[in-house]
Regions:
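GST-like fold's C-terminal all-alpha helical module
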Residues: 1-62, 67-153, 159-164
């Protein structure tokens, strides 16, 4: 999936890295940068992902210029595929974690890809979901509609309207 995406665009949402790239990079460095087993698998299945991590490591600064962004109407199909994948594991995990955090539970469990998943509750993940919702609520109505429709098309709208 990422191999196909990085074949069409150098970063997650356009031609320059955004905060989403740096956030994703943080996770990917653990899988590709430190663990030799998963790095070997990544090199075999998605060498562009390995190259992307190496490129991201060498970037510095954050450019607020948005002229390089792809409009939501012009996102490549690979972006939809990535978000569809997120809807299966990441979204239910974020929602279950947030509920558990609000209820003071030490762990949470939910079904992910028809399997029960249990994990320790992480306050930071609950805060991340709150930030996603706060940023969405800051959008004007036209942009809210576009973003919500994109998320709904990919199954990720539950991030905004989860059962909490």
């Amino acid at each position: 999936m990422l191999e196909n995406h990085f074949e069409t665009t150098p970063f997650l949402l356009g031609n320059k890295p955004l905060s989403s790239d740096f956030a994703f990079y943080g996770q990917m460095t653990q899988l590709i940068g430190f663990d030799p087993t998963s790095r070997e698998i990544a090199l075999e299945l998605s060498p562009r992902s390995v190259a992307w991590v190496d490129i991201m490591e060498d970037l510095s600064g954050f450019n607020e210029d948005s002229s390089h962004l792809l409009s939501i109407e012009n996102l490549p199909e690979t972006t939809f595929s990535i978000f569809e994948e997120l809807s299966h594991g990441y979204v239910p995990a974020m929602i279950a974690n947030s509920i558990a955090f609000k209820e003071g539970q030490e762990t949470w469990s939910t079904k992910i890809d028809d399997q029960m998943w249990e994990q320790k509750t992480f306050p930071y993940q609950a805060k991340c979901l709150e930030w996603i919702r706060d940023e969405f609520n800051e959008l004007d109505q036209d942009d809210k509609t576009k973003v919500f429709n994109f998320l709904k098309e990919t199954g990720c709208e539950k991030l905004l309207i989860g059962k909490e």
